[in-house]
Amino acid sequence: EPEISLMHVSPEFSNSYEIICWVSKNLPADVVLVVKENPRSFGIRSREYYDRLRKISNVELAQPDTNTKEWINHSLFTVAISGTSGFESVYYDKPVLSYGKHQIINYLPTVYYVSSFLETRATINELLCLNKKSGDLIKSKTVLHNALMSCSFSLPKLAENEKSDFLVEEIGAILADRLYNQYVEKI
């Protein structure tokens, strides 16, 4: 499994192919599971991996560089192991089927952590019957937003600094000085 975040956030559940099979087997016949690879991971997996996915009748592969927001907005719910898709789904008022045991979003009322095929089946049935007008979607988004804002800080000149190499050069010089001083002191 090339997705490095799976090994850190969900070491006990890192087989994405198995999860895709579980979800696809439990969806109604008229529902398609769209699988979107992280653009940075695309091409790392073997061709056989993608060929196996294409053989599953209700699975479609999205272009890795497509906008995630569009897929989430058109979904009934999203499936996440780790990464940002679960967080984005909460922000876009969509429930999440989570396989990442240690994801902080699992504490939100519209995120459903599962760890087995039977839990997947029961939770998908629950998600398909979920009242989309429920206040839980707004509550989840508000709680997540407030939690993120409470541990964030403002970077008012970020856009200005991104256009300049100054910050990179300055940080590089500081790090070079530190390395030099460490080695000089040891000699």
Language-model region placement:
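Nucleotide-activated donor-binding/catalytic signature segment of Leloir-type glycosyltransferases, i.e.
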Residues: R47-A62
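C-terminal amphipathic helix plus adjacent low-complexity
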Residues: F117-I187
